[in-house]
């Protein structure tokens, strides 16, 4: 990581004495580091230490799923509380805080006050796939500056991948990070961001341009920037560089970074269908989440996370109402038991092959 920052001009370029900086990891859920779901605490620890060494005033903050229950367990299980205790920095939950109204593209959003109060955000995403946005990277990680129920509301309002990605880019535009460092030591492919397959990648990606970082992360996964809505839309708005020809890659050659046989989410076959054709093909190409009763432990996290409340709990397992499901895959994100499986139409199965 220090090598990456040296090539960007050093830590002093991004942190100065007395500067208030918020470290924003990917704390998707209360899963331990070995699950590969959250930014590894060793990465968070290294960043916090470097920022403090530069004289900055540091806090760690995020808004995970099911945060309304309280985030104390999240801090403990992810290892972030141990980091905060070691360096005597604050852990900031965005739940229950005052929200600040912001307008982007004539759409209104409510951002947690602590995010606005800090002079800069140090963004620490993890290299993972995402069932809705394909890639959850530096741009998508900033979606976490919204308090929990605000995120759920946007999932409900914008269930389609491109529309939801547009909202994600709106939120990113409100508070672009001053630096993004992606934890790609162990990546996740398949049906991420909560229940994919872990892959050894051995990468730390860093950039002052979060959009360019995501463009490079896409190459790692075998994706062009225009295949990831958040990267394409953010680049089109001028929020960063999404043109690979204009991105200078340091430390590795382009041909070295792709991961062989990297699996994209099953839902990618549906996401590739243009919005104008999606309704026409909806009965032919579909991916539908289902709860595997044999794996479900009835923890209730999917019930709480569902933005349209189409999941109910029975005596044996959670059950999804297929008629009401909007295929946002929030249930898959938060399930700690890998109990959410993806049923696929015949044509979808053929396309995935």
Give the residues covered by each predicted segment:
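N-terminal and secondary-structure boundary signal
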Residues: 1-293, 297, 303-308, 312-317, ...
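Extended, alpha-helix-rich binding/interface surfaces that flank or overlap catalytic cores
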Residues: 326-327
């Amino acid at each position: 990581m220090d090598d990456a920052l040296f090539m960007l001009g050093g830590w002093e370029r991004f942190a100065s004495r007395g500067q208030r900086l918020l470290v924003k990891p990917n704390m998707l859920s209360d899963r331990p580091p070995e699950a590969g779901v959250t930014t590894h605490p060793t990465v968070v620890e290294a960043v916090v230490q470097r920022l403090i060494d530069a004289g900055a005033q540091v806090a760690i903050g995020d808004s995970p799923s099911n945060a309304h229950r309280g985030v104390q367990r999240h801090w403990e299980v992810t290892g972030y509380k141990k980091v905060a205790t070691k360096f005597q920095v604050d852990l900031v939950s965005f739940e229950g805080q005052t929200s600040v109204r912001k307008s982007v593209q004539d759409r209104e959003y409510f951002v947690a006050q602590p995010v606005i109060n800090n002079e800069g955000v140090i963004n620490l995403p993890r290299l993972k796939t995402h069932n809705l946005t394909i890639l959850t990277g530096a741009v998508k990680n900033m979606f976490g500056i919204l308090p929990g129920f605000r995120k759920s509301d946007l999932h409900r309002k914008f269930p389609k991948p491109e529309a939801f990605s547009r909202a994600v880019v709106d939120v990113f535009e409100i508070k672009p990070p001053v630096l993004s460092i992606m934890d790609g030591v162990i990546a996740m492919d398949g049906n991420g961001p909560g229940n994919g397959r872990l892959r050894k990648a051995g990468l730390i990606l860093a950039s002052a341009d979060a959009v360019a970082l995501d463009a490079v992360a896409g190459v790692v996964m075998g994706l062009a920037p225009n295949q990831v809505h958040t990267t394409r839309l953010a680049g089109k708005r001028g929020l960063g560089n999404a043109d690979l020809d204009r991105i200078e890659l340091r430390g590795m050659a382009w041909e070295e970074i792709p991961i062989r046989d990297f699996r994209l989410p099953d839902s990618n076959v549906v996401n590739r269908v243009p919005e104008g054709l999606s309704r026409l093909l909806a009965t032919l190409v579909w991916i539908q989440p289902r709860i595997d009763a044999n794996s479900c432990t009835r923890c209730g996290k999917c019930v709480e996370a569902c933005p349209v409340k189409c999941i109910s709990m029975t005596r044996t397992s959670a059950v999804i109402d297929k008629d009401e499901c909007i295929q946002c895959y929030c249930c898959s994100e938060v399930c700690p038991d890998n109990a959410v499986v993806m049923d696929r139409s015949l044509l979808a199965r053929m396309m995935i092959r």
